[in-house]
Amino acid sequence: MSEFWYTKATMNKLNPDYIRFEHFSPTHLFVTAIFIAIIAAAMIFYHKLDEKGRQKFLYIMSALLIADELWKHILSAATGQWEWEFVPLHLCSINIFVCVINSFKRDKLTSEILYALCVPGAALALLMPTWPNLPFLNFMSIHSNSVHVLLLMSPRLLLAGGFRPDFRRLPKVLAIVLCECVPVFFLNKVLDTNFFFLNGTAGNPVLKILASIFGKDFYFIGFIPLLAVVWFFMYFPWYLAKKKKAKTSV
């Protein structure tokens, strides 16, 4: 079987020493720059569309996300490599469904979830990917890159369309995440999976730092202060912009 069809687990077994690129290497930064350019171009294009065009664009985004997820399941199953880890219960995978719901409703809560969770989650995945042992021309590598680009793009499109984040909706977002974490935590124990990164650091440098601070069994406690810092930088500029707008309108 060609390496194009290997999953990460298969590559680890057959070629454990293979590394396509190191984090923040020239290759990694070049590919990331291409992804940023694609997202920026999509935002500009979306901003210029009328309301009907924007709705169609979001439908297309949802269709691409679903197709991307199905591509992973169909090809991994067809090659006998499907595993429970592929169930769409990772934080980014769950946001695929949030994107689909948002494309039909475009309500403030799902938009906030996408901004608060999808942006940092997908950005971290692209900046510090957990699949550097897969070749670029590999179906799982293509899926991992494309799905995270689409997930990062979705909330950026909402911003280009006029959505403005509001930190006052964050308690609801956090409550939803915590409610999801409880069943996922126990499901990880039953299936030996790592949904929400609650059952291991998966080689992620950020999670390794948390493990060094809080211990390998309690690293996930560090998610709370880490998320608080990330949200501060994500929301404070919008808060200042809103205050400035309120002053100028008086």
Enumerate the predicted regions with their spans.
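Hydrophobic core of alpha-helical transmembrane segments in multi-pass integral membrane proteins
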Residues: L29-H47, L65-L70, C181-F185, I224-P237
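Aromatic-anchored segments of alpha-helical transmembrane domains
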Residues: L64-I74, C118-T130, V177-L187
